[in-house]
Amino acid sequence: MRLFLFSGIGVLLQVKGLMRSYFSLLLCITAFYVSPVQAISDCSTGNNDQEVYTCAQKNRNETELDLNKEYKLAKARVQTLFKDENKELSQYMDALTEAQRAWLKYRENDCKLASYAADKGSDLSSSYSNMCASELNEQRIKKLKLIPYH
């Protein structure tokens, strides 16, 4: 009977540990969906080129702010997670910084490609580039919310 009781307690503790893990996962997922990121406007509904240009510029500015904010939050989460492990913290922060710089370069080149068909320097070219950047910024924000990966 005692062996059964102890093994039952062990199973109960394991279940509680699993529940704690699942609860932590649920909190992370909930935070991801509840986070106040503004939805970008649909600029294709503009009545003329100037409206589309203004809308695309506004969206880009907003998503840039959100991107910078989320990057700072990701860095803060990493610092909190690795606060007692200086070497790991330094390596993670270096990797995060390197990844962000590489992503920014990717975004720049991808959006250059997206606006390639329009005349360089035109409002249309800028609109395509801004819409591309806004879309990629939103994707990156979602990815940054998952950092640190564990």
Language model segments and positions:
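Residue-identity detector for glycine
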Residues: 8-10, 17
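Sec-dependent N-terminal signal peptides
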Residues: 24-26
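N-terminal signal peptide c-region/cleavage motif recognized by signal peptidases
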Residues: 31-36
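Intrinsically disordered low-complexity regions specifically enriched for long asparagine
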Residues: 1, 6-7, 86
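N-terminal alpha-helical modules
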Residues: 37-150
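Positively charged n-region of N-terminal signal peptides that target proteins for export
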Residues: 2-3, 16-22
